[in-house]
C-alpha cells in the first residue's frame, strides 16, 4: 500500500471538489470570543498554579524544547522544565479543556509548527495555539527572556505582541489561537497531531465522531467510524509507521484500527470489557531494531519472514484494570490482533496513607479506577503505567514475567497522566543506539535486580492529589502543588514573613513560601485535617507573640469556624455556626494601654508613653527615637505589642456570615457562638443599625472597630461595641474595611465596595485638652461628683439630641469635607461599660463631652471596572494600598499623591483577595476565581490604571471550512463573538457595545431616520451567507475572468445579419470552462439557452449532494418542479430527510407529499422522536397510525387522549387501549390497573370483569384489601 500516494490523491480530490485557496479561507473567518483574541501581558514573579483537570486521557503533553502543558479548568498552563518556571497560559475555551497535545518537529520542514499546540474542550471546539518559549537558540544555559519570564502571553496571549499584525508569527512573547473549528456536536475527548504528516490533526468526541483537520488548507472532515450505542471515543493514537492509520479507543472497550484516508475500518479489536483509557502504538522499526518482544517466545513460525519486520504491536489499558500487549496476527493488518500478554497492575497496587486529604482508593470501585500508559522510543524496553493507587510502574517488555520496578512514592492518589520528556536535541538515532546497547546488556543479565533500570527521559506525572511531579532517576525532583478551588483569602505574619496562608475552595489551607526556596518555589504545605468545606476566610494569630503565631482561624463555606494549629497539624471546630458562608474572620487584638488624649507636641507624647510603659513594662524606652523610618517604625510597633503581651493568650474570635456577627471563645471549643447583633443593639439602644453586616476590622490598637453593611454604610465602634459614628459614602455593599497598620496613620480607614470605588477616610479627635485635664484632676477620687457628672452628662445628651434631632440622620454628610471647608464636630456618646480600665481613664470617659470626631475623605479612588473585592495596606509604606477587583486586576494606589501607580493584569476571572509581602516592599500576592495565586512586583508593571493601554487585539483565529456539510445559519450565528466569562461593566454606557437587537428596542421609538440606521446596522451585522453554487461561486470577485469579456461582448452584439457577414454565430461559443476546442468561451450564467442553464443547475446540485448539503440540494432542484421528484428520491435514499425538505415536497404533488410525511415519521420513530412523528402522521390524516405509534411505544396515556379527541366515546380502540394499559400496570401499579379495568367493564367482548376479579385475588396489598370486599360486592 502506497500510503503517501493515497494521501496525495485524497488531498487532490478535496481541492478539486472545493476550489478553496487561502484567499477563500480568509473570507470565512469567524470572530472568536473576546478573551481568545486578547493579547494580555502578565508580569507576575511567581505563580502557584491551578491543578490539572481530572479523569481525562490526554490532559498533558511535552515537546522537544521541554515545554510542558496541561489542562486546568478552561485554560492551559505552560511550564518550562529547563528554567523551572511557569511561562504563560492559554485562555480561550469556554468550558473544561479535556485534551492537549503538541505538533511534532519535522527536521525536513522549514516551518514553526512544532511551536504550536492543540486543545480540545467540552465547549465542542478544537483550537490550535501558537506560543513561543524563547528557546529558539536552544541554549539550555540561558533563562527565559524577561518578556516571557513573567508570564508574558498568559491570559490568551501577550500584550507585547500584535504591534504588527502581519508579523505576529514572529512575536516571541505571544500566545494566541490561530485556528479553530466547531465541527463536533459533543464534547471533545481527545486530540492528537500526526507524527508523520505535519498539518494533520485528529479529534474525537463523546458522540463517537472523528474529525480530520488539515491545518495547511484549514479544512475539516467529520467522520463517524462506527455507528451504535456507547460509542464515545476515549483516546486516539496515530501509527508511527503508517501515515493513514489511527487506533481509536472507545468507552465500550473496543479498539478500532481505522484508515482515515479511505474512511474504512481496517480491524476491530474487542480489547477490554470497560472504557479504553490509553493506547500505545509501538514504532515497529525501533521494536525490531532493539529486539523488543523477541525473548518472550511470542513470535510465530513465520518470524524469519521479512514481512515480520512490519508487524504491529499495541499496548492498551482500561478500567477493567488490565494492561494488554497486542500483536498483529498475519502479514496484513486486516488479519487482526492477538493478545500476547496481560499485565496486572492491581497486583502491585499498595494502599498509601494520604498526606493531602481525601483518603485512599477502593480498587473495587470502577468509577475510581484509572490507568494510563507511556512509552518513548528513547527507552523502548520499558512501558510506564500507574498502579491502581499512586505508584508509577515500569514494565519490562523483554521479560514480561519480571515484576515491575516502582518509582519512589510521592503521589498519594490516582495518577491521570504520565509524560516522558523527550531529549532537547531531538536526536533519536543517538538515543536509540544507546538504548540498544543497554537493551542487549539487559538481555544478558535478565536475572539481575530490576533496580538497575535506568530511563533515558525525565518523567512528569499529574495526579488526583493535585500534584505535578517531575521525576529523575525514579526519584521525585520537583513537586508542584496545584490549587483545586477558588482562592478566597490570603494572610501572612511577621513571625514567618516568607510564608503566605491561603484559604482555598478545595477544602484546604495552603502554606506557600515562594521566596524561601528558590530551587522549588512551587512547593507548598497542605493543611486539610478537619476541614470539610471550602475555606472562605482565614486569619493568622499575629498579635499574641511567637508561640501563638502557629494558629490560623478559618471560616468555611458551610458556616462553621475552626482554628488550625500548624505545629500539631490538627484543627478544632466550634459547634454550631452561620447558616451560609463566612465572609470574614478576625482575632480580637489584645488590650493595650491607651495613651492620654489630645497631645499637641512630641515632648508630651514621649512623656505619656514613658508613663504608660512604666505601668506595664519598660521595654519601650529604646523605641521612641526611631520614628523617621516607616519600616523601622512598623517593626517597633510590632515588637512593642509582642513584648507587652508575652504572657497573654488569644481570647476571642469574630466572624461575619449570614449578615450576622458571631463571637467565639478560643479558650472553650465546646461553647457555641454568641450572636453580637442583639448585644450591639442593647449597648446602643438609641441607634438603628442595618441588619446585613458584611465585614469587620479592628484598628491598630484594637480600641476601635469598623463594621460594613450591605447598604454601603460603615459604623465605627469602641472595642466594647459602643457606637461612635457612622459613615455613608458608598452606595452599594461594603466588601472590605481596613485600618492602616502604622501608628501615625492609625486613624485612616479604607473601604472597598461593589460600587467599584475605594474610599480613604481619616478620623480625627478634636476638643479642649487643658479643660479636660483640669476636669480629670478635680474629679480624681470624688465618687459623688462622678455620679453627678453622669447625671449632667445624660442631661447634656438629652439637650444635644433635642437640638440636633433633625440632623442625626445625615450627620456624616454634614461633617465630610472634601474641599477644605470648615470641619464639623461630632460628639461621642458617653457610656461607661468597661470595668477593666483604670480609674483615670474611667473619669475621662465619663467627662469627655468636649472630645469630638472629625471625619474627612482623603480621596475616592475610581478606576476599577467591576466590584472591588478586597483592599490591603502595605506593611512598609503607610501611603500604599492594594485593591483586588472582579475586573481581574490588582491595583496599587498612593493615598498621599492620590494616584494609581500600578495595575497588575493576568488573572482569568475575579480577584478575591490581595496581601502584601513582609519581606519585599514591592511584592504582593493575589488570588481569585482562576484558582491561582500570583506574586507581583508592582514597581515593574507596565500599566498604572485599568484603562491605560487597552489590551491589544491579535489577528482573529481562522475558522475551519467544513467539506462534509453545509454551515447553517444557526452555526454561523454561533460563530459570532461569544460573551466572555467576565461581564464588561462599560457595556451599559457604550451603545457601540450593546448587541444589535438591543439597539433595535432602544431606537424603535425614535424617528424614522434613526430606525433606518439601526436596521442597516443589524443587516450589516448578520452572518454572511455562503453561495449555493460551489463550482461557480464568487464569479464577481474572480481575478482571472478578463478572458471572458471580449467573447461576451461579441456574443451579445452579434445578430443574424452580422453572422452572415462574419460567419460567426452564437452557437460557436462554448459555455463554461470545459471547452473541448479553442473557441472563445463565456460563462454559462450569461447564456440564453435553457438547456445550458439546466446543465449548470444539474452539475451544481450533484456537487451539493456529494457533500451532503441536502437542504441546498432540494432548494436548487425546487426551482424546476420536474427535477424535484428525483431529488426527493435521492434524499430519501440517503436517509437525509428533514422537516424543511418535507415542507418543500408539497411542490411535487399531494401524493408525494403524503408519502414523504409517512417516511419522515418512520425516520423520527427510529430516532425516538415519537411526538413529532405523530404530528406528521396526523398532518396527512393517518389517525389510526398515529395512535399505533403511541401504542407500540407504551405511551398509553397519549394514545388514549388522542383517540378520545378524534373518535366517538364508544369506539372499540379506546377500550382496547385501557385494557392493554391495565395489563401493563398489573404488577407495578395494581390500583391504576383496577381503574383501567373498571373503565372497560361494560364491554362484554373484553372480559374485563373476570380480569379484575383475578387481579383482586392475586395481588394482596394493604390498599387493595381495603377496597376488595366493596369491589367484589359491586361487581356481583
UniProtKB/Swiss-Prot annotation:
Gene3D superfamilies: YVTN repeat-like/Quinoprotein amine dehydrogenase. Residues 778-829 form a coiled coil. The record marks 368, 413, 466, 486, 528, 579, 732 as: Interaction with U4 snRNA. Residues 53-55 are annotated as: Interaction with U4 snRNA. The keyword RNA-binding applies. It comes from Dictyostelium discoideum. Belongs to the WD repeat gemin-5 family. Pfam families: Beta-prop_RIG_1st, TPR_GEMI5, WD40. Its main location: nucleus. Keywords: Coiled coil, Cytoplasm, Nucleus, Repeat, RNA-binding, WD repeat. This is Component of gems protein 5. Residues 794-809 have a biased composition (Acidic residues). The record marks 583, 910 as: Interaction with U4 snRNA and with the 7-methylguanosine cap of RNA molecules.
